[in-house]
A protein has these predicted regions:
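Extracellular cadherin-type adhesion modules in metazoan precursor proteins
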Residues: 1-378
C-alpha cells in the first residue's frame, strides 16, 4: 500500500487498521503499510468446497492531525492453480454397436453434459479434452475408434467391424485439462467397453461344415441317398438322406431372436433333367420326398444341386450336392450265356487243376452267368 503519512515512530500522523476482515485471512503491518496472507494452519483454496475467489478487506486510515477517517478497499484476487486432476463421473462406460454400422458413425456420446469428466479447477485448468489411448490388452481398439472432436469426447467408428472376428473392444479414453503449460496438464482415464452386435451379413451354410484351412469357407458337401426302383412314394417317403440335410444361418446371434431369418430349401438344378417329376424338397424342413416310382431301366442315379437361402429378402445362398442312387428291384433271374458247357482235363491232373475249353488244354473253360437286374457277370 502507499498511503500518505506515517503510522510509526515518535510522531505518527496516521493510524491504520483492518475492517471486515472475514476469517482473518489478512494481516496488516501498519508501519510498513504491508498486507500479509494469514494461512497458518490452513490452505487458501479457490476450488470447491472453499471457493475463495477473492478476499476483500477495508483498510481504515485515521488522520491523527485532524481526526478524519478514510476507508481504502483492498481486493485480493485468488488466481487458480492447476492442482486438481479431472475425474470421470463413472468408473467405466458402455456402448453397443452393430457390426454393419458404417465407418464414420458416432457410436458413443456418453460424455455429454456432466456425465463425462469434470475438473474443479478454473479456466483452461478446468476445461476437458478427450483422447483415445493405446490399450496393450486390446491393441486394435485405438485403431478401430477415434475421437475427432476432443472437447466433446464423442467416439466415432474408424474401421469396419466384423462380429465373427471380434465381439468386444476395451477402449481406454484419457481426459486431460487444458493447462497452457503442457507439462503441467493433469490426466485421468476410463474404459469404454464396446460390444459388437451380430449383423445379417452372412448367409446359411450346410452342415456338417468342414472348413478349408485358413478360411471360413466350407469344403464342398455331398449328401447321399439310395432308393429301390419301382417303389411307391407311400413306401419310401420321407427319403432318408445321409447326413440329414440341414443348414444354419452363420449369423448366429442376431438380436432380438425374432429378427433372425429363417432358411428356405430348394432343388436348384440336376441331372437327369426330368428330376422334378420324381423328387420334391420341403422348403422349410429340407425333407426329401418321392413323387412317383423310378424305373432303373431309365434312371440309375440323380445328381442334384440343392440351395439354402434366407427368407428375409437377403438370400445369400449356400449350395450343396445331393446324389441319389437308384437300387435294382431284383426282379430278374440269373441266366447262363450257353445252354451247356464242355470241358477237358488230363486224367493225371491233380486235384484243383484248371479245366480247359479245348483238347489242346490252352485256355480255361469260362462259365458265364448274367443278371439283368445288376447287368454284371457273376
Amino acid at each position: 500500500m502507499l498511503i500518505k503519512g506515517t503510522a510509526g515512530g515518535p510522531d505518527p500522523t496516521i493510524e491504520l487498521s483492518l475492517k471486515d476482515n472475514v476469517d482473518y485471512w489478512v494481516l496488516l503491518d501498519p508501519v510498513k503499510q504491508m498486507l500479509f496472507l494469514n494461512s497458518t494452519g490452513r490452505v487458501l483454496d479457490r476450488d470447491p468446497p472453499m471457493n475463495i475467489h477473492s478476499i476483500v478487506v477495508q483498510v481504515q486510515c485515521i488522520n491523527k492531525k485532524v481526526g478524519t477517517v478514510i476507508y481504502h478497499e483492498v481486493r485480493i484476487v485468488v488466481r487458480d492453480r492447476n492442482d486438481n486432476s479431472p475425474t470421470f463421473k463413472h468408473e467405466s462406460y458402455y456402448a453397443t454397436v452393430n457390426e454393419l454400422t458404417p465407418v464414420g458413425t458416432t457410436i458413443f456420446t456418453g460424455f455429454s453434459g456432466d456425465n463425462g469428466a469434470t475438473d474443479i479447477d478454473d479456466g483452461p485448468n478446468g476445461q476437458i479434452e478427450y483422447v483415445i489411448q493405446y490399450n496393450p490388452d486390446d491393441p486394435t481398439s485405438n485403431d478401430t475408434f477415434e475421437i475427432p472432436l476432443m472437447l466433446t469426447g464423442n467416439v466415432v467408428l474408424r474401421k469396419r467391424l466384423n462380429y465373427e472376428d471380434k465381439t468386444r473392444y476395451f477402449v481406454i479414453i484419457q481426459a486431460n485439462d487444458r493447462a497452457q503449460n503442457l507439462n503441467e496438464r493433469r490426466t485421468t482415464t476410463t474404459t469404454l467397453t464396446v460390444d459388437i452386435l451380430d449383423g445379417d451379413d452372412l448367409g446359411p451354410m450346410f452342415l456338417p461344415c468342414v472348413l478349408v484351412p485358413n478360411t471360413r469357407d466350407c469344403r464342398p458337401l455331398t449328401y447321399q441317398a439310395a432308393i429301390p426302383e419301382l417303389r411307391t412314394p407311400e413306401e419310401l417317403n420321407p427319403i432318408i438322406v445321409t447326413p440329414p440335410i440341414q443348414a444354419i444361418d452363420q449369423d448366429r446371434n442376431i438380436q432380438p431372436p425374432s429378427d433372425r431369418p429363417g432358411i428356405l430349401y430348394s432343388i436348384l438344378v440336376g441331372t437327369p433333367e426330368d428330376y422334378p417329376r420324381f423328387f420334391h424338397m420341403h422348403p422349410r424342413t429340407a425333407e426329401l420326398s418321392l413323387l412317383e416310382p423310378v424305373n432303373r431301366d431309365f434312371h440309375q442315379k440323380f445328381d442334384l444341386v440343392i440351395k439354402a437361402e434366407q427368407d428375409n429378402g437377403h438370400p445369400l445362398p449356400a449350395f450343396a450336392s445331393l446324389h441319389i442312387e437308384i437300387l435294382d428291384e431284383n426282379n430278374q433271374s440269373p441266366y447262363f450265356t450257353m445252354s451247356s458247357y464242355q470241358g477237358y482235363i488230363l486224367e493225371s491232373a491233380p486235384v484243383g487243376a484248371t479245366i480247359s475249353d479245348s483238347l489242346n488244354l490252352t485256355s480255361p473253360l469260362r462259365i458265364v452267368a448274367l443278371d439283368k437286374d445288376i447287368e454284371d457277370v457273376s
